[in-house]
Amino acid sequence: MAKDTRGRKKTARRSVSEGVAHIHASFNNTIVTITDRQGNALAWATSGGQGFRGSRKSTPFAAQVAAEVAGKAAQETYGVKNVDVLVKGPGPGRESAVRALGALGYKINSISDVTPIPHNGCRPPKKRRV
């Protein structure tokens, strides 16, 4: 079988000093995405992608590890130094992910809660009976 000679187009390594860290913390998983100001993704990581499975995915420690992985990737590849943090969702990994980014040496300019709140939209799921 002949090898495809076209190959992938190399993306130019650009230097991005300011970025936005999007932390989506659901009850089951935590997704951390670091983007530039325009919203183009630079690096991302999830709790499940770091090897945590089942109920361990939704722990604060799993969110911390995901934030460290995404943060290191954005720092090493693009040189991101300052971030605005946007936190979405009610999950347990909210604060620990923000703390992990601060511990990596990021200067956190602002922390905003952008959790979507319905103005009486869809009917919520019924209460759990355990």
From Swiss-Prot:
Signal peptide: none annotated. This is Small ribosomal subunit protein uS11. HAMAP family: Ribosomal_uS11. It comes from the Bacteria. GO terms for cellular component: ribonucleoprotein complex; ribosome. Keywords: Ribonucleoprotein, Ribosomal protein, RNA-binding, rRNA-binding. One of its GO terms (biological process) is translation. Part of the 30S ribosomal subunit. Interacts with proteins S7 and S18. Binds to IF-3. NCBIfam families: PRK05309.1 (NF003698), uS11_bact (TIGR03632). Gene3D superfamilies: Ribosomal protein S11 (3.30.420.80). Pfam families: Ribosomal_S11. One of its GO terms (molecular function) is rRNA binding.
